[in-house]
Amino acid sequence: MGGTRAVALLALGSFAMGTDAYAMAGLLPAIGADLHVSVSLAGQSVTAFTLCYALAAPLFSAVLARWGTRTVLVTALVVFVLANAGTALTGSYAGLLGTRALAGAAAGLFTPAAATAAVALVPPERRGRALGLVLGGMSAGTVLGVPLGLLVAAAHGWRAALWLITALGVAALLGVAGALPPVRGAAAPSLRARFGALARPRVAVVVAVTFTQTVAGLGLYTYLEPVLHRVAGIGSVVPYLWVWGIGGVCGSLLAGTLVDRTGKPALLAVALLGTLGGALALLPWAGAVPGLVLLPLVVWGAVGWAFVVPQQHRLLGPDAQGGAAAVGLNSSATYLGGAVGSALGGLALAHGLDAGRLPLLAAGVACAGVLLHLTAVPALARREARTGRPTTEHAHGAGAADATAAGAPERNAP
């Protein structure tokens, strides 16, 4: 099987994960009503998903990687299917939290393994596009899977939407188990090596900026329905989630091409983060004009999803051991940020904050990420200039992808 077809199978798995992760925002009111809890409390099921996603990659990947990348992917999909079936069957709030946590752990294992497999299956000059396709599969879940799931939920209840997601997981499982070729992945880094990557200043900056971006973007997305209802008087959020998802697909796919052509993932990342802050700040004001709210939504989706590609690209370099550890941490930061954002958003709403103010708070967090990037990266450059040599993290893993994009040779992961 060619590399492109194999990457497409990984994108199918990402599609199932994306549908699961992002459909929940539209299902929270129905879930809360069925289980007799508030929307903000039901939203903590998203926190459970994202928190376990964040913890799964560093805690379990080092052990499971001994089985091989393909086996890790299949295992993650099996757990994902069982967890979503459990969510569909649960009759208690505790059961909801437990099954969502299990689904999040499965997604946390699948996503970094899929990213690592994607770059191992294609030539170096196509790695940006391969990453974009895998991540685009997840954002495609928001365009096709989320609206379809919400329509099914409107007609047959929220549990039917979870059964649909379970079926998507089964399809992805059959495809990956039956057709994905063996993948030559990196040697599994130890837990100490994974967290030790944070001692590298450049890796730490990339991971910290990713964290701020997802606190803002994913945290706000969890409560998109009450936000849109407050700022624009919108009832059904299905078409608006669809617009957000279309932006996400376009952003994911275009970002990979931009990274490959420009060779400047760091510059692209900070530009995207600044644009995200502007789009979120515009959201409350755009809601006052009919139809205008679509503009910040599509921009938010596009730049939010596009941001992941240059960040991952900066961490996947010729030092496969360091790159795998850094990518796992970055994936963890992505969903840890979502968990923190969801938890803080739910807490704010539970304490009476006007839902229309949430986008402004999220915009402030995004701007803090821009400030962090603009101050930390030049400081590291000055440090390198003083010492007369690049920092270790620039030579190994974090900056290696930048060198590759600029034309330096890069080898496949051993």
PLM region spans:
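Helix-to-loop junctions at the C-terminal end of transmembrane segments
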Residues: 56-69, 251-264, 349-350
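C-terminal transmembrane helical hairpin of 12-TM major facilitator-type secondary transporters
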Residues: 266-310
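Helix-breaking motifs and short loop linkers at transmembrane-helix boundaries and internal kinks
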Residues: 34-36, 68, 89-95, 263, ...
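Conserved MFS/SLC helix-loop-helix module at the cytosolic interface between two early adjacent transmembrane helices
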Residues: 55-91
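Cytoplasmic helix-loop-helix junction between adjacent transmembrane helices
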Residues: 93, 99-138
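A late C-terminal transmembrane helix in Major Facilitator Superfamily
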Residues: 318-354, 362
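Paired small-residue
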Residues: 83-86, 94-103, 291-299
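C-terminal membrane-cytosol helix-exit motif in multi-pass small-molecule transporters
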Residues: 166-186, 372-376
